[in-house]
Regions:
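Beta-strand signatures of extracellular beta-sandwich domains
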Residues: 78-82
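Bacterial N-terminal signal peptides
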Residues: 7-15
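Extracellular/periplasmic metallocenter environments
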Residues: 21-30, 51, 104-150
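Short aromatic-acidic-glycine turn motif
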Residues: 85-96
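N-terminal edge beta-strand
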Residues: 33-64
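Asparagine-centered strand-capping/turn motif at beta-strand->loop junctions
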Residues: 69-71
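Sec/Tat signal peptide C-region and signal peptidase I cleavage site
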Residues: 16-20
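Positively charged n-region of N-terminal signal peptides that target proteins for export
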Residues: 1-4
Length: 150
C-alpha cells in the first residue's frame, strides 16, 4: 500500500507536466502579445461563414499590429494565429473536444456580429498562418500574415 501512494503521486505530476508541456508559451516563434501603446497600424479582417477577408496581409518584422476581427457570418468563429502545424493540431483537438473552452493569447473567439481585437508583435520574418480551428471550418477558413524583413 505504501508503495502505491508514491506511484499515484508520480503519475499525477507526470500527467500535469505533460499537459503543461503541450501548453503554448507566452512568446511564440510567430511573436508575442503586443503593447497597445506601440501599435504601428491596424488591419481589419472579416470572417464570413467560409473565409477570411482579406485572406493575406503583410506586416514588417518587429511591428506591433492591431488586428480587428469581425465575425460577419451566421456562426461562431475563432481566429487563431500560429504555424500551420500548430493550427492543424488545434483543429484536430477541437474535433475531438468541441465543447472544451480555450483561452490562448493568440486566439480570438467571436459570436455572430461580434468584433474583437488582437494586438500582436510580429518579431520574426516569415509566414504566420491564421485559421478558424472550429470543426467544419478549418479547411476553408484560413489566411496568411506575411512578415517582411525590416
Amino acid at each position: 500500500m505504501n508503495k502505491i501512494i508514491p506511484l499515484v503521486i508520480l503519475a499525477l505530476f507526470s500527467t500535469h507536466s505533460a499537459a503543461a508541456a503541450n501548453h503554448i508559451p507566452l512568446e511564440l516563434d510567430i511573436g508575442k502579445p503586443g503593447d497597445a501603446d506601440k501599435v504601428s497600424h491596424t488591419i481589419k479582417l472579416t470572417q464570413v461563414d467560409n473565409m477570411f477577408l482579406p485572406a493575406e496581409v503583410r506586416v514588417k518584422e518587429g511591428e506591433t499590429i492591431r488586428l480587428v476581427i469581425k465575425n460577419g457570418g451566421n456562426h461562431k468563429h475563432e481566429m487563431l494565429i500560429g504555424s500551420m502545424a500548430e493550427l492543424k493540431k488545434v483543429a484536430n483537438m477541437r474535433r475531438m473536444y468541441p465543447d472544451k473552452e480555450h483561452a490562448e493569447a493568440h486566439l480570438v473567439q467571436l459570436e455572430p456580429g461580434e468584433q474583437k481585437e488582437l494586438v500582436w508583435q510580429f518579431t520574426t520574418a516569415g509566414t504566420v498562418d491564421f485559421a478558424c480551428p472550429l470543426p467544419g471550418h478549418f479547411k476553408k477558413m484560413r489566411g496568411k500574415i506575411i512578415v517582411e524583413k525590416k
